[in-house]
Swiss-Prot record:
Pfam families in the cross-refs: Ub-RnfH
HAMAP family cross-referenced by the UniProt entry: UPF0125_RnfH
UniProt xrefs under InterPro entries: Mopterin_synth/thiamin_S_b, RnfH, RnfH_sf
Family to which this protein belongs: Belongs to the UPF0125 (RnfH) family.
Identification of the protein by name: Protein RnfH
Length: 97
């Protein structure tokens, strides 16, 4: 079966296509892909993984054409990012000129 394993940093992305036998787990596919050698900072014990954007367990069996994604940890609070991106509201009771 042909599958893909992907990982992305802000400055570098990797998409590896590999052939695996039926019954291969997510963890086995990641290990076989060699991506752990390219990105030694990946820690499968702490980082989440998914298939096509949906969380997956390391022992889940992959299917033909699957795209396994290794997710980086969140380093910024999403609420902080949203707050920074939102336009400032006028002060309560204030008037605009």
């Amino acid at each position: 079966m042909k599958i893909g394993v992907v990982y992305a940093l802000p400055s570098r992305q990797s998409w590896l296509s590999i052939d695996v036998p039926e019954g291969t787990t997510v963890k086995e596919a990641i290990q076989k892909s060699g991506i752990l050698n390219q990105f030694p900072e990946i820690d499968l014990e702490t980082q989440k993984v998914g298939i096509f954007g949906k969380a997956a367990a390391l022992d889940a069996v992959v299917e033909e054409g699957a795209r396994i994604e290794i997710y980086r940890p969140i380093t910024v609070d999403p609420k902080t990012v949203k707050r920074r991106a939102a336009p400032e509201a006028p002060a309560a009771g204030g008037t605009e000129s």
